[in-house]
């Protein structure tokens, strides 16, 4: 590949090497982009970064050479131990020495301000070097290499903490309700399901806060004593009989407390109750329960209801027990015995219970009665034959 390039360059001089090149030709002089060489040389001398040598280019190996060097020097400098032929004697650049180690290549960072050479060297470093600092190192390089970051040491957690501090809920009281160390200013309670505030901003427990909200006054600290029963009020005695126990305390015309008995007696008779009527115990009525009369009426109704079906059943049975009219010549041989059994069954049914129904309620036709006791001769013959079979 490089041989082909070399062969192509050896065929003849380049277009810009001859006398009729673009920069020295007459057509180039009339071109708008044409720059005379005198102006170029003056511009090159005025530029600080293209000067031959200076205090600012001491650390760079490239700064020791001129940009526009001679052809012979350029050819020897461009090919230090290489087989590449020279390209152009006019526009050639000097090459840097071969890089042997990464530390040999250094890049200097210079400030455009007017700083001395020592100051520039202080703030310049190579690729493998570190900045020089007047302060001591926080930790040694060995410790820094062996240090491993913890799984919780990340910038995300720090951002979350800062965000939590900045984005605090505006209603701070809502979060402060769960804090410890509060005390109710009224009752001194340390714990409550809900902390409240009074009109002045002091903290109240839930009970004191609700009491203050409903009644408008502070909740009393001492619970009121339970009201004693009327029969055992402390310090009360009847002004008439001087008793201390009663079911109901009353007042007389003078406003003095009296027992229930003396008060009723005075109200009914208009005179004070005599002391001879005083009793040790309190007489109470033996009141009957109000549901007792209702239960009795219910039992009476149930008894009457239980009797009515039996009477109706006996009437229906009596109607069913009535004999059926039979023609005189077709009476069965067991008619007489059947009538007796029916009569006995009817007597047992009617005699059930306390009620008794007489036999005349059963009406029999005279024809049937005559037929039962006076059968026809044909029926008698059949009846006799049947009796003979039974007796045999």
Curated annotation (Swiss-Prot):
ZnF (GATA-type) intervals: 184-208, 238-262
GO cellular component: nucleus
Principal localisation: nucleus
Biased amino acid composition, Low complexity: 302-316
Taxon lineage: Eukaryota, Metazoa, Chordata, Craniata, Vertebrata
Keyword Lyase applies: no
Subcellular location: Nucleus
Species this protein is from: Xenopus laevis (African clawed frog)
Highest taxon of the lineage: Eukaryota
SMART domains linked to this entry: ZnF_GATA
InterPro entries recorded: GATA_N, TF_GATA_4/5/6, Transcription_factor_GATA, Znf_GATA, Znf_NHR/GATA
Region of interest (Disordered), residue spans: 75-113, 279-339, 359-392
Listed Basic residues bias regions: 284-293
Keywords linked to the UniProt accession: Activator, DNA-binding, Metal-binding, Nucleus, Repeat, Transcription, Transcription regulation, Zinc, Zinc-finger
Residue ranges, compositional bias (Polar residues): 91-113, 364-380
Name of the protein in its database record: Transcription factor GATA-4
Tissue specificity note: Expressed at high levels in heart, small intestine, stomach, ovary, and liver. Found at much lower levels in lung, spleen, pancreas and skin.
Pfam families in UniProt: GATA (PF00320), GATA-N (PF05349)
Function as written in the Swiss-Prot or TrEMBL entry: Transcriptional activator that binds to the consensus sequence 5'-AGATAG-3'. Associated with cardiac specification and can regulate cardiac-specific transcription during embryogenesis. Activates the expression of cardiac MHC-alpha in vivo.
GO MF term (any one): RNA polymerase II cis-regulatory region sequence-specific DNA binding
One Gene Ontology term from the biological process aspect of the record: canonical Wnt signaling pathway
């Amino acid at each position: 590949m490089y041989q082909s390039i070399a062969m192509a360059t050896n065929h003849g001089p380049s277009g810009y090497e001859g006398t009729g090149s673009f920069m020295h030709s007459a057509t180039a002089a009339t071109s708008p982009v044409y720059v005379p060489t005198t102006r170029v040389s003056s511009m090159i001398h005025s530029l600080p970064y293209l000067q031959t040598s200076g205090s600012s280019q001491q650390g760079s190996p490239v700064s020791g050479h001129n940009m526009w060097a001679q052809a012979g020097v350029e050819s020897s400098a461009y090919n230090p131990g290489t087989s590449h032929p020279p390209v152009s004697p006019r526009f050639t650049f000097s090459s840097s020495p071969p890089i042997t180690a990464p530390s040999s290549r250094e890049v200097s960072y210079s400030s455009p301000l007017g700083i001395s050479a020592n100051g520039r060297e202080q703030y310049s470093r190579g690729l493998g070097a570190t900045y020089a600092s007047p302060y001591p190192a926080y930790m040694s390089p060995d410790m820094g290499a062996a240090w491993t970051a913890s799984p919780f040491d990340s910038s995300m957690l720090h951002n979350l903490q800062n965000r939590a501090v900045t984005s605090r809920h505006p209603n701070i009281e809502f979060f402060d309700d769960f804090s410890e160390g509060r005390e109710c200013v009224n009752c001194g309670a340390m714990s409550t399901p809900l902390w409240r505030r009074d009109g002045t901003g002091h903290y109240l427990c839930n009970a004191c806060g609700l009491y203050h909200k409903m009644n408008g006054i502070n909740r009393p600290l001492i619970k009121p004593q339970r009201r004693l029963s009327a029969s055992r009020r402390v310090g009360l005695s009847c002004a008439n009989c001087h008793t201390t126990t009663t079911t109901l305390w009353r007042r007389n015309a003078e406003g003095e407390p009296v027992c229930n008995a003396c008060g009723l007696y005075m109200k009914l008779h208009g005179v004070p109750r005599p002391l001879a009527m005083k009793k040790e115990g309190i007489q109470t009525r033996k009141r009957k329960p109000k549901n007792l009369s209702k239960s009795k009426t219910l039992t009476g109704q149930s008894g009457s209801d239980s009797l009515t079906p039996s009477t109706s059943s006996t009437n229906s049975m009596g109607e069913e027990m009535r004999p059926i009219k039979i023609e005189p010549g077709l009476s069965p041989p067991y008619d007489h015995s059947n009538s007796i059994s029916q009569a006995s069954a009817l007597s047992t049914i009617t005699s059930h219970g306390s009620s008794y129904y007489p036999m005349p309620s059963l009406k029999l036709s005279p024809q049937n009665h005559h037929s039962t006791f006076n059968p026809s001769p044909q029926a008698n013959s059949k009846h006799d034959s049947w009796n003979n079979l039974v007796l045999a």
